[in-house]
């Protein structure tokens, strides 16, 4: 492979190094990964720290309530599917009269699996203390950080969808992510102490609070109060699954991916 010539137009540059490398869509998230390397951690420590940091610095694309998939090579390829299941009380009749699953509200919500991925990956390969992986993200959330232009654009789009929503399930989104009644502008400093407190509790309990403790109780209570179907039982029964990766050959290259239910990109 020629690393200095591209068959297409690109403004990106090849970055080389001798020991470690981290690449993300956000420099502060990349820095979170590098901090783990500098502390003596390995690639899995760095990847988890990056994923946690992205819930803060790119909340429009990543979240504590999201799912996660992972491919890890340690001499052989491992696949992890940490996507969540639908709530047990979500029956097919609730979609009567609909032609597709709605984009907003409680109906499309599944059990959030990302936290279980962080814990599961760390248990198998992590080298640093679990709580240490959260330190950069907590720092960004508490002290604030400059919002990137791309994130500001996505945030503005989300504002257009939810700023005037009157349904009770959107109240905390508006208070947290539209604190001035609008989305933050590019370069504006934004942070969330509540986000930091949540991450700190996840870190201190090894993720247990999120699925079987205080955070799980709060999520289930909020769902019950606002018309959601997610329960403490749904959260407690969640687990990440080790899966066999699938592959295909394309132009002499073998491409590996997580099998369905992921979309494979």
Q: What spans do the regions from the language model cover?
A:
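Noncatalytic scaffold domains of N-terminal-nucleophile
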Residues: 1-31, 35-38, 43-205, 210-212, ...
């Amino acid at each position: 492979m020629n690393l200095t010539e591209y068959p297409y137009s690109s403004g990106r540059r090849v970055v080389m190094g001798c020991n470690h490398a981290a690449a993300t869509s956000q420099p502060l998230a990349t820095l979170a990964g590098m901090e783990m390397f500098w502390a003596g951690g390995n690639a899995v420590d760095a990847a988890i720290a990056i994923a946690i940091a992205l819930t803060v610095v790119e909340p429009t694309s990543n979240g504590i309530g999201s799912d996660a998939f992972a491919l890890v090579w340690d001499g052989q390829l491992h696949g992890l599917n940490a996507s969540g299941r639908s709530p047990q009380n979500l029956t097919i009749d609730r979609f009567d009269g609909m032609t597709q699953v709605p984009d907003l509200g409680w109906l499309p919500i599944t059990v959030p699996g990302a936290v279980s991925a962080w814990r599961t990956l760390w248990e198998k390969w992590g080298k640093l203390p679990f709580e240490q992986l959260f330190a950069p993200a907590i720092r960004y959330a508490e002290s604030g950080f400059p919002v990137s232009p791309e994130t500001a654009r996505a945030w503005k789009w989300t504002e257009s969808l939810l700023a005037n929503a009157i349904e009770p399930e959107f109240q905390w989104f508006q208070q947290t992510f539209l604190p001035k009644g609008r989305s933050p502008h590019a370069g504006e400093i934004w942070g969330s102490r509540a986000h930091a407190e949540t991450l700190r509790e996840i870190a201190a309990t090894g993720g247990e609070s999120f699925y079987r403790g205080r955070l799980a109780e709060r999520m289930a209570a909020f769902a019950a109060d606002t018309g959601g179907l997610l329960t403490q039982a749904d959260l407690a029964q969640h687990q990440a699954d080790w899966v066999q990766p699938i592959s295909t050959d394309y132009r002499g290259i073998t491409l590996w991916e997580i099998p369905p239910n992921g979309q494979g990109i």
